[in-house]
Amino acid sequence: VTDVTDVDEQGRTEPPLADDEVGTLTGFLDYQRATFEWKTRGLDAAGLGATTAASSMTLGGMLKHLAYVEDNWFNRSLHGRDPAPPWDTVDWQADEDWDWHSAAHDSPDELRTTWSDAVARSRTAVADALADGGLDQLARRRWADGRAPSLRWILCHMIEEYARHNGHADLLRESIDGETGE
């Protein structure tokens, strides 16, 4: 296991170059999380609510969506826990994109706190799963067809989820204030 101390100009810890599987996966996920934090850093409500082109996607909606995704995969799916607030009272049948739409009613501080709290819960959930069965541990909530993804799969999926949304965040942030960068 290699200690990671390389931090870039945006304050992101670089993923490890030579670590074990857990360190590599969590290092890349944390790097993607840090990239997303950078893309939303310092924006006010207008910035977090801005859209671009024909999309209704906003950085504020993305903060809330990624908070939901963190909680859904690492706590609800992996550990079989009941949804945490605010997800526990959502009528997803009435609005399947509630996380995106409701963000317009939240302050920037509320959105950032919702996301950072979800990330903290996810880190704890991953640590618990690693201690209890490692990367091969299967999610407690099975899919409709009876299959269950492993923690390894969930970590890879979350890296993909953040990488995709970080591409969206790049475009949105540049349209707001011209800030660019990976």
PLM-predicted stretches and their roles:
Residues 95-137, 152-158:
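Acidic/histidine-rich alpha-helical segments that form the ligand environment
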Residues 18:
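Short, aromatic/basic-rich helix-turn unit that serves as a nucleic-acid recognition element
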